[in-house]
């Protein structure tokens, strides 16, 4: 990459999965900071994980693998979900901004994942889970109220990361960088050091 050096990785959610793979394959970064990395998906109830694997595996080779995965929504989450029950942020202003971006620029809208995407993601997360952690300084942040990614996978990965540090943010939901100001500040301060 022809960018000023040194390089640092900051990655959120699925970006955390992609970023971890890139680091494992030699991305030349000095350190990494992960925000609620998707190293596993939180299924509720947990038995849904079995169904997700089975259905996405069966649908993957078919032409319908590009269809929205069963149980996923075609309307973007921040448009159909109200603030009180959302799983992304406790900051009403930040949550409103997320939805407003999509209303102003509809081309930014994403629906739920396709069955093919879900299957590829599940496979990649399992492959990464089986690998040792990189020899690289890292920070990882997750909230106690996380409902999108699998917290156990994060805890397991960071316990195996010799020069890694996990910060668990009390009450925080999935969007650490769009959470209440004191949580955002904690993330940006530690990441910037």
Where are these regions (language model features)?
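Alpha/beta-hydrolase fold nucleophile elbow
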Residues: 2-13
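Active-site nucleophile elbow and catalytic-triad environment of alpha/beta-hydrolase enzymes
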Residues: 109-131
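Short beta-strand/loop motif that positions the catalytic acidic residue
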Residues: 134, 140-142
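Conserved alpha/beta-hydrolase "nucleophile elbow" surrounding the catalytic nucleophile
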Residues: 11-16, 143
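Core-facing hydrophobic residues within beta-strands of well-ordered domains
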Residues: 4, 29-30, 164
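Conserved alpha/beta-hydrolase "acid-adjacent" motif
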Residues: 147-153
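Catalytic active-site module of serine/aspartate enzymes centered on a nucleophile-bearing elbow/loop
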Residues: 165, 170-193
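Alpha/beta-hydrolase-fold enzymes
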Residues: 14, 18-109
